[in-house]
C-alpha cells in the first residue's frame, strides 16, 4: 500500500510504502461499529444514581382504605406508579457498562479504519512536525498553510512543544500510535502520521 507524503505546504510529493496487512484491509463496517461502541461503553463512568422504592423517603401508611372510595387501590405513596415514587429499575453508579472485544478483533478493526482512511485520502504521512516553541499560533499557521482544520496527529514520540501548542486548538489532537483509538480516527477529518509512527503502527497491528 502506498501512502501519500505531504510537505509543509500540504502538497503531495513522494509516497511511502506501507504494509497491506494494516493499510490495505477491506472495509468491515460491522466490526468497526462493534469496536467503536465498545470504546464508548468502556469510557462510561456510571455517574448517575436514582432511588428505588426502598430508598425514597415516604410514609408506609396506606393512602386510603382498600374498598369503597371508588379510586384505584393503593398501598403506599412510594409506589413507582406515583409521582415522587421510587424507580422500578433505577440507574446506579455500580452499573457495569464495559464491553469486551477480543484483541484480534480490535486490531482488525483498527486496520480496517486505517485502510479506509487511506482509500478516502484522509490519511497522509509527514516526515515530522517540529515546532521551535510551544506556541499555538505556530501550529495554527502551519495547519493553515497545509489547508487543515481538523487533524489527528500520530507521532512516534510526543514532542512537548507540539503537545503544548495543540492543547488550545479545538479540533487538533496529538497521540502516540498505542493511544490511537477508533473514535478519534473516525472523528477527525484528517489523520497525519509521521514516517517513524507508520512503522510503529505496523508493529502494533500486524
UniProtKB/Swiss-Prot annotation:
GO molecular function: rRNA binding; structural constituent of ribosome
Disulphide bridges: none
SUPFAM superfamilies recorded: Ribosomal protein L4
A Gene Ontology cellular-component term: ribonucleoprotein complex
Keywords linked to the UniProt accession: Ribonucleoprotein, Ribosomal protein, RNA-binding, rRNA-binding
Gene3D superfamilies assigned: 3.40.1370.10
Bias-annotated ranges (Basic residues): 58-70
Region of interest (Disordered), residue spans: 46-78
GO terms for biological process, alphabetical: translation
InterPro entries associated with the record: Ribosomal_uL4 (IPR002136), Ribosomal_uL4-like (IPR013005), Ribosomal_uL4_dom_sf (IPR023574)
Stored PANTHER family: 50S RIBOSOMAL PROTEIN L4, LARGE RIBOSOMAL SUBUNIT PROTEIN UL4M
Functional note: One of the primary rRNA binding proteins, this protein initially binds near the 5'-end of the 23S rRNA. It is important during the early stages of 50S assembly. It makes multiple contacts with different domains of the 23S rRNA in the assembled 50S subunit and ribosome.
Oligomeric and partner information: Part of the 50S ribosomal subunit.
UniProt record similarity statement: Belongs to the universal ribosomal protein uL4 family.
Protein name per the record: Large ribosomal subunit protein uL4
Amino acid at each position: 500500500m502506498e501512502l501519500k507524503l505531504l510537505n509543509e505546504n500540504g502538497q503531495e510529493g513522494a509516497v511511502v510504502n506501507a504494509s497491506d496487512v494494516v493499510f490495505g484491509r477491506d472495509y468491515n463496517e460491522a466490526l468497526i461499529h462493534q469496536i467503536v461502541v465498545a470504546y464508548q461503553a468502556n469510557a462510561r463512568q456510571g455517574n448517575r444514581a436514582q432511588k428505588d422504592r426502598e430508598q425514597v423517603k415516604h410514609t408506609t401508611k396506606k393512602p386510603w382504605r382498600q374498598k369503597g372510595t371508588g379510586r384505584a387501590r393503593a398501598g403506599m405513596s412510594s409506589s413507582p406508579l406515583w409521582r415522587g415514587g421510587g424507580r422500578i429499575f433505577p440507574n446506579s453508579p455500580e452499573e457495569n457498562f464495559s464491553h469486551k472485544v477480543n484483541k484480534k478483533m480490535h486490531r482488525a478493526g483498527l486496520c480496517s479504519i486505517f485502510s479506509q482512511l487511506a482509500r478516502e485520502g484522509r490519511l497522509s504521512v509527514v516526515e515530522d512536525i517540529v515546532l521551535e516553541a510551544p506556541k499555538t499560533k505556530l501550529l495554527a499557521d502551519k495547519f493553515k498553510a497545509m489547508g487543515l482544520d481538523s487533524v489527528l496527529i500520530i507521532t512516534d514520540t510526543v514532542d512537548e512543544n507540539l503537545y503544548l501548542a495543540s492543547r488550545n486548538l479545538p479540533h487538533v489532537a496529538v497521540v502516540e500510535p498505542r493511544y490511537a483509538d477508533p473514535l478519534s480516527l473516525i472523528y477527525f477529518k484528517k489523520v497525519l502520521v509521521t514516517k517513524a509512527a507508520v512503522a510503529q503502527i505496523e508493529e502494533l497491528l500486524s
